């Protein structure tokens, strides 16, 4: 029995000293020498996989109390919670347990009091709170030296002060024991320091057994999963499986490093998914804002009685994307919370692996394992792709009636509707018939929100409903709200509706899946009458209302456009498309024309094939409805309510400061006031009653602008817009080039002196005609000059009454203008600088 105990003691001493046991030899030494490098590699791998966003603050949190933010020191009795956050014992309050038994052989286990973590608010039992051994050696060096000075020899029972320290045995020795240590054959080769702290080879402070006060914890009992001393292993842990400290540390570090690497890879995926969700939320918000602007541009064109009904429909349409946005918000919130938790676990585990405190690592491995396994079991749903949403509208889509304005119909392709069939005659889907297949789910009528039909003869063609519902595959009842659509402000609508016109209808065509975006269609209530379906009257027949266009709010995938014309998308990224669809004869629509090019809001304006407009042939649009009448360029245009000419704000004379109202008329159509009523004492030559020459009176200014605008819009005058070939004008020289751009600049007082009389204005125009006549030798051009002079005289006579301007249409002597030398772009306010 004694021999067996001696053998066990020798084996324990061998483990503590680090010398190779029987049969190990140099190979065992090599194995131990590679263990630190393997642990360092695993630690480096964990550090590489740890999040970079932690920074110094996250690492500082590991060494500071989560409550008082003070640095954790041994005298503050740091405690480690199961969530791997640390706090002072005093900050945790009475629920904090006393220091647990290091060897696991005794000590109070604590009660079942529930404690809230001061950092992450997770609840845990007080018995699960352990001492933070990583912070055990964080005290000042002075305190450490003072403690080492009081260390007694552990090899004898004399309690003599220790003067030396054996590195292999990790024991403080007195002078007598040092001599005995060097005489024994087994220990004579040990490294003995004359003085120094009681630390092991790795530089960490030795932890002593609570039962055997002088015995260090040098063994790891696998059966009890705890550190033991040699005496405890021979007594309380007899016949248990155990490992030497170095072997246990090496094995546990490998396991922890593997778990940290796995969690690091999963955390990287979570970070990517979180960024994608955040990006998706921003994109959904941006799409909503963009579509909201597009819808406002269309809503401003329709009639004022649509205001009341339109608000209800827009509020219903907002539910189209609401579900997806709320789901993404919840998913992002959950992912962010899990991400922060995993970041802390990774930081703590990496910090523990990088630490050289093997004892603390083994004592805390349960908590670390638990959190790593728990984090690995968390399942994060993948980010679902979202589609592209567009807004398309037809300029001539709006109707005259706001009573029973329409409805929202939800259709899901590939699903069969189990609800009652809508009480309406057969309708053709129109231009959007290929945008989705499947049945239409009628809306459920809700009390207080029905669309009353009144006396409208065509109102019975559509069910009057407002509830936004949709059916799911395999379900017989309607459930779920449509996802959110952009909000549209209708306060600026000022429209005139008549009771004998058919209201438009709102329809929602959902995507192919539950997550796809939906399609909202605004069409005339009687549009089915012109589609040529059996049972309906074709367009143009008696009793059939005219076919109207459609305004479409469109949400679709980027590369799978639903029903968009070939010109509506270019490249992989689609733009919002403003479609100008044709309307039947007699239909009236809004007057804001933006037919081609790009508008200020980024809308791409296209004209689908086969469409026509008043004044144009089949498949084409009239030039007056596509480009500016003055500069012949597209862009943001305003349309005259009478002549239907389109102008840029700067091209019109006088220049427009803001977008005019619906009933706006250009200067060519505007009725000018009587000269005598406005001018008073001013005569046609611009002189007042005192004889002092002044600039044009307001009435004469308006008349000259009207005549000049007529010249700009007159097609034969197109070559006269800018005759100057140089970059600057040179009117101060005889024969200087003169064109409509310069005349416009002087009329708008961009050149001085401005015109003081209509006669002076007429002289400049006549001089321009003569200069152009000198530049050409073609007889046709000469005849056109004569025709232009007659056109100008006619316009002047119409504006100024019976006054004859033939006498002043002669070339006056050259005049030097202070504005000479200005570039044409500085002088031109319209033809050359349209939007």
Swiss-Prot record:
Q: Which reaction does it catalyse?
A: S-ubiquitinyl-[E2 ubiquitin-conjugating enzyme]-L-cysteine + [acceptor protein]-L-lysine = [E2 ubiquitin-conjugating enzyme]-L-cysteine + N(6)-ubiquitinyl-[acceptor protein]-L-lysine
Q: How is it modified after translation?
A: ATM-induced phosphorylation on Ser-824 represses sumoylation leading to the de-repression of expression of a subset of genes involved in cell cycle control and apoptosis in response to genotoxic stress. Dephosphorylation by the phosphatases, PPP1CA and PP1CB forms, allows sumoylation and expression of TRIM28 target genes.
Q: Where is this region: Involved in binding PPP1CA?
A: 366-370
- Impact upon substituting residue 490 to E: Abolishes interaction with CBX5
Q: Which residues form the Bromo domain?
A: 695-799
Location of region: Interaction with MAGEC2: 247-376
Consequence of changing residue 709 to A: Greatly reduced sumoylation. Little further effect on sumoylation
Protein family (similarity comment): Belongs to the TRIM/RBCC family.
Identify this protein by name.
Answer: Transcription intermediary factor 1-beta
- Species assigned in the record: Homo sapiens (Human)
């Amino acid at each position: 029995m004694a021999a067996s105990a001696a053998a066990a003691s020798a084996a324990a001493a061998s483990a503590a000293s680090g010398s190779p046991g029987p049969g190990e030899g140099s190979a065992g030494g090599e194995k131990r020498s590679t263990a630190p490098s393997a642990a360092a590699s695993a630690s480096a791998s964990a550090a590489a996989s740890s999040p970079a966003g932690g920074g110094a603050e996250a690492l500082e949190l590991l060494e500071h109390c989560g409550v008082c933010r003070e640095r954790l020191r041994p005298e503050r009795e740091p405690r480690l919670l199961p969530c791997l956050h640390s706090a002072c014992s005093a900050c945790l309050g009475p629920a904090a347990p006393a220091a647990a038994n290091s060897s696991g052989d005794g000590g109070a286990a604590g009660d079942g009091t529930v404690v809230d973590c001061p950092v992450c608010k997770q609840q845990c039992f007080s018995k699960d709170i352990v001492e933070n051994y990583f912070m055990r050696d964080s005290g000042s060096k002075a305190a450490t030296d003072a403690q080492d000075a009081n260390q007694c020899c552990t090899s004898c029972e004399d309690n003599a002060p220790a003067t030396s320290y054996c590195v292999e045995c990790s024991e403080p020795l007195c002078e007598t024991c040092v001599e005995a240590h060097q005489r024994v054959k087994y220990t004579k080769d040990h490294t003995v320091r004359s003085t120094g702290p009681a630390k092991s080879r790795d530089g960490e402070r030795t932890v002593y057994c609570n039962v055997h006060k002088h015995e260090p914890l040098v063994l790891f009992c696998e059966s009890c999963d705890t550190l033991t001393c040699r005496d405890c292993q021979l007594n309380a842990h007899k016949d248990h499986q155990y490992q030497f400290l170095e072997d246990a540390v090496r094995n546990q570090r490998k396991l922890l490093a593997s778990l940290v690497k796995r969690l690091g890879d999963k955390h990287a995926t979570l970070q990517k998914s979180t960024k994608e969700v955040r990006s998706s939320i921003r994109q959904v918000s941006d799409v909503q804002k963009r579509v909201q602007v597009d819808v406002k541009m269309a809503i401003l064109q329709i009639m004022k009685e649509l205001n009341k009904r339109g608000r209800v429909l827009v509020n219903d349409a907002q539910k189209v994307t609401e579900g997806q946005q709320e789901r993404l918000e919840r998913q992002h919130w959950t992912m962010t919370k899990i991400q922060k938790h995993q970041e802390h676990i990774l930081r703590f585990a990496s910090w523990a692996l990088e630490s050289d405190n093997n004892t603390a690592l083994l004592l805390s491995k349960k908590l670390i394992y638990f959190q790593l396994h728990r984090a690995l079991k968390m399942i994060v749903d993948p980010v679902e792709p979202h589609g592209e949403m567009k807004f398309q509208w037809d300029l001539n889509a709006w109707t005259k009636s706001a009573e029973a304005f329409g409805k929202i119909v939800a259709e899901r392709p590939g699903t069969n509707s189990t609800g009652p069939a809508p009480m309406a005659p057969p309708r053709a889907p129109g231009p959007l018939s290929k945008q989705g297949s499947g049945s239409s789910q009628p809306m459920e009528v809700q009390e207080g929100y029905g669309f009353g039909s009144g006396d409208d003869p065509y109102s019975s063609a559509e069910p009057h409903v407002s509830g936004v519902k949709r059916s799911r595959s395999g379900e017989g009842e309607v459930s779920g709200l449509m996802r959110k659509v952009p909000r549209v402000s209708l306060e600026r609508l000022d429209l005139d509706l008549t009771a004998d016109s058919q209201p438009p209808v709102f329809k929602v065509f959902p995507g192919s899946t539950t997550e796809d975006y939906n399609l909202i269609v605004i069409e005339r209530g009687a549009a089915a009458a012109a589609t040529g379906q059996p049972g309906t009257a074709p367009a143009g027949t008696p009793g059939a209302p005219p076919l109207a266009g459609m305004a479409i709010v469109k949400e679709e995938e980027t590369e799978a456009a639903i029903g968009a014309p070939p010109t509506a998308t270019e490249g992989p990224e689609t733009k919002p498309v403003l479609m100008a669809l044709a309307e039947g004869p007699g239909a009236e629509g809004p007057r804001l024309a933006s037919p081609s090019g790009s508008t200020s809001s980024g809308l791409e304006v296209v004209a689908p094939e086969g469409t026509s407009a008043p004044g144009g042939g089949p498949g084409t649009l009239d030039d007056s409805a596509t480009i500016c009448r003055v500069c012949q360029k597209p862009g943001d245009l305003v349309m005259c309510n009478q002549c239907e000419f389109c102008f840029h704000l700067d091209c019109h004379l006088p220049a427009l400061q803001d977008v005019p109202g619906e009933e706006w008329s250009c200067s060519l159509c505007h009725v000018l006031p009587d000269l005598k009523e406005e001018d008073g004492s001013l005569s046609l030559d611009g002189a007042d009653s005192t004889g002092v020459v002044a600039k044009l009176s307001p009435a004469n200014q308006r008349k000259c602008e009207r005549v000049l605008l007529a010249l700009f819009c007159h097609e034969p005058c197109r070559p006269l817009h800018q005759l100057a070939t140089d970059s600057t004008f040179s009117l101060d020289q005889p024969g200087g080039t003169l064109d409509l751009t310069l005349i416009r600049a002087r009329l708008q007082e961009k050149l001085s002196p401005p015109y003081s009389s209509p006669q002076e204005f007429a002289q400049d125009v006549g001089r321009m005609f003569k200069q152009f006549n000198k530049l050409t030798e073609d007889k046709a051009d000469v005849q056109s000059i004569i025709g232009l002079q007659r056109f100008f005289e006619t316009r002047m006579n119409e504006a100024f009454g019976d006054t004859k301007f033939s006498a002043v249409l002669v070339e006056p002597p050259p005049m030097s203008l202070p504005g000479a030398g200005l570039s044409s772009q500085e002088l031109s306010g319209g033809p050359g600088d349209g939007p």
